[in-house]
UniProtKB/Swiss-Prot annotation:
GO terms for molecular function: N-acetyl-beta-D-glucosaminide beta-(1,3)-galactosyltransferase activity. Residues 1-7 are cytoplasmic. Gene3D superfamilies: 3.90.550.50. It catalyses: a globoside Gb4Cer (d18:1(4E)) + UDP-alpha-D-galactose = a globoside GalGb4Cer (d18:1(4E)) + UDP + H(+). Catalyzes the transfer of Gal to GlcNAc-based acceptors with a preference for the core3 O-linked glycan GlcNAc(beta1,3)GalNAc structure. Can use glycolipid LC3Cer as an efficient acceptor. The gene is B3GALT5. GO terms for cellular component: Golgi membrane. Keywords: Glycoprotein, Glycosyltransferase, Golgi apparatus, Lipid metabolism, Membrane, Signal-anchor, Transferase, Transmembrane, Transmembrane helix. This is Beta-1,3-galactosyltransferase 5. Its main location: Golgi. Pfam families: Galactosyl_T (PF01762). InterPro entries: Glyco_trans_31 (IPR002659). Belongs to the glycosyltransferase 31 family.
Length: 298
C-alpha cells in the first residue's frame, strides 16, 4: 500500500511543479495580451548636460542601458563612448534608462547623472519589454533637443562600436537625409511560441511577416529620420520589439534600408575578439567591459 501512495504523491508533485513553472514563465511575459502606447506627453526625468545648438554633433550615440549596467556604462565612457572628435567630427554618447522600484538603484543613477551629465530618462519601468519606449524616448530627445545632429546611432550596453571606422564610412557614404543602415533583416516572421523571449501574439501583430528592419543591437540613421520617425510613431501599430517598431515607422515613411559597406560591418551574433578584426567592423554584440578596455589599450 505504501508504494502506490508514494507514486501518487510523486505524480502530484510533478504536476504541481509543472504548473508552477508554467505560471512563473507566463508572468515573465507581461505583454502577452496587453496594449502599451508610447505617450509623447510624458516628461523627461533626466536630460543630459549638453547644448546641440552651440556645438552640433556629427554623430549622436544612444545607448539603451539598465540600472544594473553601471560597469558597462563606465567602460563605454572610457572607450568608444568618450566624447571626442574623429576626423574633425564631434561625437557624443548618451544612455537611455527607465525607472526602477529599487530606491538604492535610483539614488545611484541620480548621482551618476549628476556626475556625468549623459543620462536620458523617463518614467516607465526599465524592463526588456519596454525597449520600444526606451528607444522612442531617445529618438524623441534627438527630435526635440538635438535635431542638428548629422547622424544618430541606437545601440546597446553590451556592444563594441568602432566609432572611428563608422565615422569614416559615413563620410564616404555622403548621405545626409533619409538614410538608415545596420544589420538588415529583410525576411523575418513573428514568433508565435508563447514562451519565447520574442513572442508576439496575433492581437499585437496580426500579420505573418515583418517589414524590413535593422537589428536593434545597432543601427545608424541620418538626423532627419529621428524627427520623421517620431512624428509618424503614433500612427503606427505599436509592438514591443523596438527594432520591428522602428521598421514599421520606416515602412510608413517609405524609407529604404541601405548597406553601409560592401563587406559585413554589423555583427549582432557576436565575433571572436581580435584587435585586427575589430578595426574593420562597426558593431559587435556580446562584448564585456573588460574586452572594450583591452581593445582601447591595444
Amino acid at each position: 500500500m505504501a508504494f502506490p501512495k508514494m507514486r501518487l504523491m510523486y505524480i502530484c508533485l510533478l504536476v504541481l511543479g509543472a504548473l508552477c513553472l508554467y505560471f512563473s514563465m507566463y508572468s515573465l511575459n507581461p505583454f502577452k495580451e496587453q496594449s502599451f502606447v508610447y505617450k509623447k506627453d510624458v516628461n523627461f526625468l533626466k536630460l543630459p548636460d549638453t547644448d546641440c545648438r552651440q556645438t552640433p554633433p556629427f554623430l549622436v550615440l544612444l545607448v539603451t542601458s539598465s540600472h544594473k549596467q553601471l560597469a558597462e556604462r563606465m567602460a563605454i565612457r572610457q572607450t568608444w563612448g568618450k566624447e571626442r572628435t574623429v576626423k574633425g567630427k564631434q561625437l557624443k554618447t548618451f544612455f537611455l534608462l527607465g525607472t526602477t522600484s529599487s530606491a538604492a538603484e535610483t539614488k545611484e543613477v541620480d548621482q551618476e547623472s549628476r556626475r556625468h551629465g549623459d543620462i536620458i530618462q523617463k518614467d516607465f519601468l526599465d524592463v526588456y519589454y519596454n525597449l520600444t519606449l526606451k528607444t522612442m524616448m531617445g529618438i524623441e530627445w534627438v527630435h526635440r533637443f538635438c535635431p542638428q545632429a548629422a547622424f544618430v546611432m541606437k545601440t546597446d550596453s553590451d556592444m563594441f562600436i568602432n566609432v572611428d571606422y563608422l565615422t569614416e564610412l559615413l563620410l564616404k557614404k555622403n548621405r545626409t537625409t533619409r538614410f538608415f543602415t545596420g544589420f538588415l533583416k529583410l525576411n523575418e516572421f513573428p514568433i508565435r511560441q508563447p514562451f519565447s523571449k520574442w513572442f508576439v501574439s496575433k492581437s499585437e501583430y496580426p500579420w505573418d511577416r515583418y517589414p524590413p528592419f535593422c537589428s536593434g543591437t545597432g543601427y545608424v540613421f541620418s538626423g532627419d529620420v529621428a524627427s520623421q520617425v517620431y512624428n509618424v510613431s503614433e500612427s503606427v501599430p505599436y509592438i514591443k520589439l523596438e527594432d520591428v517598431f522602428v521598421g514599421l515607422c520606416l515602412e510608413r515613411l517609405n524609407i529604404r534600408l541601405e548597406e553601409l559597406h560592401s563587406q559585413p560591418t554589423f555583427f549582432p551574433g557576436g565575433l571572436r575578439f581580435s584587435v585586427c578584426r575589430f578595426r574593420r567592423i562597426v558593431a559587435c554584440h556580446f562584448i564585456k567591459p573588460r574586452t572594450l578596455l583591452d581593445y582601447w589599450q591595444a
